[in-house]
A protein has these predicted regions:
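Negatively charged, low-complexity tracts enriched in Asp/Glu with abundant Ser/Thr
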Residues: 2-55
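Solvent-exposed, charged interface segments at domain starts and junctions
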Residues: 1-7, 62-67
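Lipid-handling modules and contact-site tethers
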Residues: 4, 8-12, 16, 92, ...
């Protein structure tokens, strides 16, 4: 990849986090936090993976006490955004950073965290 391509990817990643990831997390907090015993908040936890350049995480605590932490992250120089339940590492989903939508990401975060849909 050339330097221009890396710059374009970096800009796109910033755009995705600002306009897709954070709004999805804020929407989940508004829709679920303190509703029917759920606790939902943004946390600083992240996966232990080399090369992660940017990430955001949300914790969903279910009424019975079960906690799920969903991390959305980007590995430097890739064109993939990953949503992963970092407490159940085998559960993840990747998205193309140039086509990911709020709806796709919200649906996957709900699925990975076990939230009602």
């Amino acid at each position: 990849m050339g330097q221009d391509s890396n710059w374009q990817i970096d800009d796109r990643v910033d755009d995705v986090f600002n306009n897709v990831v954070i709004p999805v997390f804020e929407s989940l907090i508004n829709d679920y936090d303190q509703v029917d015993g759920y606790e939902v908040k943004i946390v600083s936890d992240g996966p232990l993976i080399l090369g992660i350049e940017k990430y955001s995480s949300i914790r969903i605590k279910h009424p019975g006490g079960l906690e799920m932490i969903i991390c959305v992250y980007w590995v430097k120089n890739s064109e993939r955004l990953i949503a992963e339940n970092i407490l159940l590492i085998t559960h993840n989903k990747s998205f193309d950073i140039f086509s990911v939508t709020k709806e796709e990401l919200a649906s996957q975060v709900k699925f990975l965290s076990g939230l009602k849909t």
